[in-house]
Amino acid sequence: YPEYNIGGEAWMNYTIGSAYWQKGSRLNFGQDTELKSVMDFRLMGIASKAFHEETGYSGGLHTIFEHMCYDYVYPDIYNVLRFLENHDTDRFLPSMPKSVDDLYAFKQGVTFLLTIPGIPQLYYGQELLMNGTKEKGDGYIRLDVPGGWPGDKVNQFEASGRSEVQNDAWNFLRTLLKWRKGNDIIAKGKMKHFMVNQ
């Protein structure tokens, strides 16, 4: 306080629906919500597939490109909360990568998230490659980070308690976050769209 901000979890699977709820939106016909930040659930929904599949005219990174073309409908894109996963959804990674060479989806996803306009949100455990789907229930995607409680056999808060793949992901994300923190052009810069020419 006084810079306190509340994010609105208006779970809309389309950009215009989310933009409607943001403060200053012209889409809600003068009934301003005064809600400074809204969440980009549409991005989260398409990112979970886009970074894991082949890019073509109607799939993969092309869906991300199309989604980003609608940033202009938000009154303030820099106050849109963007994320790849959260406590109510499948994890971004459906399963644990088997080797460092299998980290391409993770690295592309977090790099994208941390270099686009908006407020990036990382869900706990993302840096440790926590993975899974809601098929087994919400508890499965909300597991404790090993090492946080007495009696835990593994401590993933220490490098020695993480696998080689987890340490690679941890170090990559740590480096990326430090780089972003020192670069206003990345954290607060503008995005320009170009036509895709395949």
Model region roles, listed by residue range:
Residues Y1-P75, D102-L103, F112, L129-T175, ...:
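Active-site-proximal helices and loops of the catalytic beta/alpha 8
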Residues E3-G7, N79-R82, P120-Q121:
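Structural preference for beta-strand elements that scaffold enzyme active sites
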Residues E9-W11, L84-H87, Y124-L128:
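Active-site-proximal beta-strand/loop segments in catalytic clefts of secreted hydrolases
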Residues P75-V100:
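Active-site clefts of carbohydrate-active enzymes
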Residues Q108:
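Conserved interdomain hinge at the start of the Helicase C-terminal
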Residues L114-Q126, V165:
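C-terminal substrate/ligand-recognition segments
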Residues K178, H193-Q198:
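Carbohydrate-binding surface patches
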Residues K181-H193:
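Surface-exposed helix-capping loop/turn segments at secondary-structure junctions
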